[in-house]
Amino acid sequence: MALTFSSPFLRVVCAGVLAVAAVPVLADSPMPLTELSIGMYRIEAEVAATQDHRMVGLMQRRSMPANHGMLFVFTEQQRHCMWMRNTLLPLSVAFLDEQGRILNVEDMQPQTEDNHCAAKPARFALEMNLGWFKQKGLAAGTKINGVERLAAQAR
């Protein structure tokens, strides 16, 4: 039996090879940066507003500077969950509503597949180094300024 490009088997194999090959490129492609603020605190956040960037997130990163993070911008407000597969850093994630108010903060351990979910429908998730929110005394109800202008970027 000859394989042609019209073969469903070959299409699946080619799609799989291309998807696997794209992961390192996505991990290396820069995400846009934005500045967020919470009272006197300033955060420089990479913006993961596309499905590809949200899938890669902070995977394979070995360090992250203080007051830096990653803001996940979701297309819909719902109960999103995060996990730590292939993520080497311990992180804390704050789930945020449409206005940028923290719904809940979850601590996440590296290279685990435990789900960490928003307590209520969330539009954003902000990942920071483990303990960052607690060290700053930030909890549910605190507003993070700057996220609301990014909602339209999600795709």
PLM-predicted stretches and their roles:
Residues A2-C14:
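Bacterial N-terminal signal peptides that target proteins for export
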